[in-house]
């Protein structure tokens, strides 16, 4: 096919979509160029599903090639390796808005690969990758209810909303939000903010939706000209005979099971009913159905039962109404030897969160397309299988854990002190010990508590809450503090973190069309009500950071030295600073401007190291008495060391009031003596006196 190109204006950026020149064997391939950022997006769809598959195997892989920024990878192998955290998060960002647009019952494998092939280092390539994904799917012929558009939004109080801000603009922005959706609906929001109001956050979502209509129009034009024929695929018809049979036999029992408030008891009862359904209706004889189909229909009845109960105003699975937060239990200081810890329990969701303080050299080194940089704040989220009563894989974190950790980090990051205010590296780890919905928001609450327990001067406590939605026709119910089942069976996952003043993080995933501005306003309003409730209970346990850092945390001292003295402190080949660190058991970081940070496991170690640095950088003061050591004797006097690296000369005439024939008659090498500084010339040479010490002491020097 001949190459086809579409160009359009997207805010301040010129975007070009090109297909038919590169990756022509893929089901769909588009090279998207947004200013100087180019991303190649390919989509491949299997023509038939694998035998026995009962799920939709969609995978999205976003990869940043270092050649795109004119760099060679670091490390020994000099080639790209496993996905970075940034690549994993962007893969999830692309996956979330497209997944709900594939039709129900579509089980063919689909793989999306987004490769950053050129970048200007000024803007994040993620928006270009999302636009390219939309275009590649639109031209592929694969069943897909798109296209989608995507935009990043910043906010400045004086300027207002900013479309697709650059990295530089984001530095002064109070908001970093990515929004994706179709022509009629918003499907995904990912954001972090500096205590913006609910109205400002909603305004940003609507602003993005209006702006990315230009993307959707351009993708439709490209698909009209270069799109492949739509696949001849039809959704499998619902087996109404089996649905009615299971409902008649077990429908009431399923409804009763969903009144059991204890999660494991409820799951056990539903498991028994599912086994009964298989025993009754599965088999190979006539009038029977495959066991997998029976289980699918049983799951469909669960889905309908829970949703009908909720939209008709009946109590939720655990007996709550739509606005009630589950009972909270909040503890801090639960682990004796850690720097800060908290145990946050909300119903059957529990997070054990630990804060650890480290030195500047403990910061995470990030190798990005823009170059290397350090990150002094880390939040790691772990979700072991025992948290849901299961056996499972243990090992390195998966995509979900990385994504949840980043969301929790977004929630608390805006409230952290600056590096100048608090020059420690901070690592927070959230161990999910029980899970039944909204463990990421439990991590936000636990992180805030653990940081305050550690004495980190956060600006304000932060809490988070997860909201849900069930919508059937014109009826809908917004749910506060959703359970795991409500998340799975609902139409929206809406997570909000913030302080009592405003929102710090907002994440939204919507599975259906028809989410109106009214519904989002209600969800944000209920989330605010719940957040203030949780903050009130957290404040009863710990309302502000502890006045002192934990005694287990390293002591950090700061000082400033003349930049000319840096080499003296470091010494030849680093010998001096290494000796100080080995002797005092402290660590020392020196910046080019002379800023010195000293970290010690104890206060005594840090103070000892500081005294050594002060001694090295000190200047000899005229008229001051020092106790020094005779380093070298010459015919005309003796050289005495009075400060580290600083020797002065005591001329033979300045040793004693009496006449001396030989210096060695009075002084010996290694002898300690008191000396008075007489003068320091412009070359730094120090003149000392021993004979004038007594008179100087008598005069009070």
Swiss-Prot record:
S1 motif domain segment(s): 623-691
Recorded GO MF terms: 3'-5'-RNA exonuclease activity; magnesium ion binding; polyribonucleotide nucleotidyltransferase activity; RNA binding
Organism: Pseudomonas aeruginosa (strain ATCC 15692 / DSM 22644 / CIP 104116 / JCM 14847 / LMG 12228 / 1C / PRS 101 / PAO1)
UniProt xrefs under InterPro entries: ExoRNase_PH_dom1, ExoRNase_PH_dom2, ExoRNase_PH_dom2_sf, KH_dom, KH_dom_type_1, KH_dom_type_1_sf, NA-bd_OB-fold, PNPase
Name of the protein in its database record: Polyribonucleotide nucleotidyltransferase
Principal subcellular localisation of the protein: cytoplasm
Keyword Transferase: yes
Cellular component aspect of the GO annotation: cytosol
Catalysed reaction equations from the record: RNA(n+1) + phosphate = RNA(n) + a ribonucleoside 5'-diphosphate
Gene: pnp
SUPFAM superfamilies (UniProt xref): Eukaryotic type KH-domain (KH-domain type I) (SSF54791), Nucleic acid-binding proteins (SSF50249), Ribonuclease PH domain 2-like (SSF55666), Ribosomal protein S5 domain 2-like (SSF54211)
């Amino acid at each position: 096919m001949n190459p086809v190109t579409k160009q359009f204006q997207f805010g301040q950026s010129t975007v070009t979509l090109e297909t038919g020149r590169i990756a022509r064997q893929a089901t769909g391939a588009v090279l998207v160029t947004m200013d100087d950022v180019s991303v190649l997006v390919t989509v491949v769809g299997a023509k038939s599903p694998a035998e026995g598959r009962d799920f939709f195997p969609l995978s999205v892989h976003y990869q940043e090639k270092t050649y795109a920024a004119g760099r060679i990878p670091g490390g020994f192998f000099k080639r790209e390796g496993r996905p970075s955290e940034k690549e994993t998060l962007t893969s999830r960002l692309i996956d979330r808005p497209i997944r709900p647009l594939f039709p129900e019952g579509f089980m063919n494998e689909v793989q999306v690969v987004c490769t950053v092939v050129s970048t200007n280092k000024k803007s994040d390539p993620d928006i270009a990758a999302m636009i390219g994904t939309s275009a590649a799917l639109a031209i592929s012929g694969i069943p897909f209810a798109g296209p989608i558009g995507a935009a990043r939004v910043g906010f400045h109080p004086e300027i207002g909303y900013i479309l697709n801000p650059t990295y530089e603009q984001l530095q002064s922005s109070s908001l970093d939000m990515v929004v994706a959706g179709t022509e009629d609906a918003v499907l995904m929001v990912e954001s972090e903010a500096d205590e913006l109001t609910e109205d400002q956050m909603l305004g940003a979502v609507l602003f993005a939706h209006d702006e990315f209509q230009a993307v959707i129009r351009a993708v439709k034009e490209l698909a009209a000209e270069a799109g492949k024929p739509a696949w001849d695929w039809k959704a499998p018809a619902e087996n109404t005979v089996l649905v009615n049979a299971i409902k008649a036999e077990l429908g009431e029992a399923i409804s009763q099971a969903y009144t059991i408030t204890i999660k494991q008891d409820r799951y056990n009862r539903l498991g028994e009913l599912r086994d009964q359904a298989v025993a009754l209706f599965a088999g190979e004889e006539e009038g029977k159905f495959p066991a997998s189909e029976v289980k699918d229909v049983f799951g469909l009845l669960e889905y309908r039962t829970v949703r009908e109960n909720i939209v008709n105003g009946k109590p939720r699975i655990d007996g709550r109404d739509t606005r009630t937060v589950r009972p909270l239990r909040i503890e801090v200081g639960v682990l004796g030897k850690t720097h800060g810890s908290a145990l946050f329990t909300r119903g059957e969701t529990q997070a054990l969160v630990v804060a650890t303080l480290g030195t500047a050299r403990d910061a995470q080194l990030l190798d990005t397309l823009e170059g290397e940089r350090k990150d002094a704040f880390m939040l790691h989220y772990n979700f072991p299988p025992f948290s849901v009563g299961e056996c499972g894989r243990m090992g390195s974190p998966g995509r979900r854990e990385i994504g949840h950790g980043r969301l929790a980090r977004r929630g608390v990051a805006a409230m952290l002190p600056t590096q100048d205010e608090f020059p420690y590296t901070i690592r927070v780890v959230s161990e999910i010990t029980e899970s039944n919905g909204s463990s990421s928001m439990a991590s936000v609450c636990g992180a805030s508590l653990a940081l305050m327990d550690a004495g980190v001067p956060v600006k304000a406590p932060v809490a988070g809450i997860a909201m849900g939605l069930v919508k059937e026709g014109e009826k809908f119910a917004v749910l506060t503090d959703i359970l795991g089942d409500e998340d799975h069976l609902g139409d929206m996952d809406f997570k909000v973190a913030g302080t009592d003043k405003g929102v710090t993080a907002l994440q939204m995933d919507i599975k259906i069309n028809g989410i109106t501005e009214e519904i989002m306003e209600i969800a944000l309003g209920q989330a605010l009500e719940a957040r203030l409730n949780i903050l009130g209970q957290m404040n009863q346990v710990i309302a502000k950071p502890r006045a002192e850092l934990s005694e287990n945390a390293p002591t950090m001292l700061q000082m400033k030295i003349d930049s000319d003295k840096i080499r003296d402190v470091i010494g030849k080949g680093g010998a001096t600073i290494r000796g100080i660190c080995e002797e005092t058991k402290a660590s020392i970081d020196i910046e080019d401007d002379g800023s010195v940070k000293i970290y010690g496991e104890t206060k005594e170690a840090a103070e000892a190291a500081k005294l050594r640095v002060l001694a090295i950088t000190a200047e000899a003061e005229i008229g001051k008495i020092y106790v020094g050591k005779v380093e070298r004797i010459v015919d005309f006097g003796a050289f005495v060391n009075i400060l580290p690296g600083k020797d002065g000369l005591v001329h033979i005439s300045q040793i004693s009031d009496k006449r001396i024939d030989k210096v060695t008659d009075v002084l010996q090498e290694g002898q300690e003596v008191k000396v008075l500084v007489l003068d320091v010339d412009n070359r730094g040479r120090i003149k000392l006196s021993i004979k004038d010490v007594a008179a100087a002491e008598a005069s009070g020097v």
